[in-house]
From Swiss-Prot:
InterPro entries: Hwtx-2-like
MF annotations from Gene Ontology: ion channel regulator activity; toxin activity
Protein name, UniProt field: Toxin OAIP 5
Tissue: Expressed by the venom gland.
One cellular component (GO) term of this entry: extracellular region
Subcellular locations according to the entry: Secreted
Alphabetically ordered keywords of this record: Disulfide bond, Ion channel impairing toxin, Secreted, Signal, Toxin
Organism field: Selenotypus plumipes
The protein's role, per its UniProt record: Probable ion channel inhibitor. Shows insecticidal activity when injected into mealworms.
UniProt signal peptide: 1-19
Organism taxonomic ancestry: Eukaryota, Metazoa, Ecdysozoa, Arthropoda, Chelicerata
Pfam families according to UniProt: Toxin_20
Stored SUPFAM superfamilies: omega toxin-like
Positions of the propeptide removed during maturation: 20-40
Length: 78
């Protein structure tokens, strides 16, 4: 009987630790996605989109941050 109780306790601890790891991964991934969305939003607001395929340029800037460029009338991550 004691072995059954200890086994169940170990399983509960293992699953709790695994759940915490998954939660931590979800937080990191959502922050990364939020950063990409912010950079894209920044690019869309700051860029003058060129029809001839030149790099997008903000006011006084050579490039958009985060690797974004204006291509095909869209702000794309390159």
């Amino acid at each position: 009987m004691l072995i059954v109780i200890l086994t169940c306790a170990l399983l509960v601890i293992y699953h709790a630790a695994a759940a915490e790891e998954l939660e931590a991964k979800d937080v990191i991934e959502s922050k990364a996605l939020a950063t990409l969305d912010e950079e894209r939003f920044e690019c869309v607001l700051k860029c003058d989109i060129q029809y001839n395929g030149k790099n997008c340029k903000g006011k006084g800037e050579n490039k958009c941050s985060g690797g974004w460029r204006c291509r095909f009338k869209l702000c794309l991550k390159i």
